[in-house]
A protein has these predicted regions:
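Condensing-enzyme catalytic core mediating Claisen C-C bond formation in acyl metabolism
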Residues: 1-38, 134-202, 207
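Short coil/turn connectors at secondary-structure junctions
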Residues: 1-2, 56-59, 86-89, 114-120, ...
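Buried hydrophobic positions in well-ordered alpha/beta secondary-structure cores of metabolic enzymes
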Residues: 4-6, 49, 61, 79, ...
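Conserved catalytic cysteine-centered active-site region
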Residues: 29-40, 67-119, 125
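Phosphate/pyrophosphate-binding loops at sites that engage ATP/ADP/AMP, CoA/4′-phosphopantetheine
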Residues: 45-59, 198-214
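Short glycine-rich or small-residue beta-strand-to-loop segments that form or flank ligand, phosphate
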Residues: 60-67, 93, 218
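Cysteine-centered functional microenvironments
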Residues: 89-99, 103, 133-137, 182-189, ...
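Flexible, glycine-rich active-site loops centered on histidine and acidic residues
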Residues: 113-146
């Protein structure tokens, strides 16, 4: 029985919203302070996640982000040291793509299922910047979430995984670009997400001998 044992989150207190001059949207967006980045937010989320647990039992930490503060330096090691975890734990960074969070979770679940790790901490943290007044700017709030994964006392069981990989030009940020760039939404949805979702869901149901009525909710 492998799954999520606990979780914790951190959302910066500052906001861009309806009262912000030049915002032009009723949507509210969380904004990291000048002294915050994805590593500091990851530390805060990780602390909330492992509060009350024996840190010495955690033997793996994966940090996932599309916006790490370093181009070449492991952020997971910084987070592990800030959380006072064991020096002999496994650490890894997963970056450069929006599915880095689910990739990190699957890697951790696979490691636990294989017996190479017992307790693993996965922290997903992001601070994506879109061009001014863009959909990306309005919809990409800053924040972090941590998951403690293991095989005992789980609150959400991991039952299976299926993925479909297709190259799609929807969101990207080239080396040195300050902002995320996007392609035509209709193309990304109609030619990309709809097809990929249908393929992935159909294959998942077939692989695990399930049907849509077996699910109360889909997110």
């Amino acid at each position: 029985l492998v799954g999520i044992i606990n979780f914790g989150a951190y959302i910066p207190k500052y906001r861009l919203g309806a009262d912000t001059i030049g915002w032009h949207s009723n949507q509210e967006r969380s904004v990291a302070n000048f002294d915050e980045d994805t590593v500091t937010m990851a530390v805060a989320a990780g602390y909330e996640c492992i509060k009350g647990f024996d840190r010495g039992q955690i033997d793996g930490l994966i940090f996932a982000s599309t916006t790490p503060p370093y181009s070449e330096k492991q952020c997971a090691a910084i987070v592990a040291e800030a959380l006072d975890l064991n020096e002999n734990l496994f650490t890894s960074d997963v970056t450069d793509v929006l599915k880095c969070g689910t990739t990190a979770l699957r890697s951790a679940f696979d490691a636990i299922s294989a017996g190479s790790c017992g307790l693993m901490l996965v922290i997903i943290s992001d601070s994506r910047q879109g061009p001014p007044r863009s959909e990306t700017e309005r919809n990409s709030g800053d924040g972090a979430v941590g998951f403690l994964l293991g095989s005992h006392n789980v609150i959400a069981e991991y039952e299976g995984f299926y993925s479909v990989t297709k190259n799609l030009l929807d969101n990207w940020r080239s080396n040195g670009d300050p902002f995320v760039r996007t392609w035509e939404d209709r193309f990304a949805i109609e030619e990309g997400l709809e097809n990929v979702l249908n393929d992935a869901i159909s294959a998942y149901l077939l692989k695990y001998n399930m049907k849509p009525s077996d699910f109360a909710r889909v997110a």
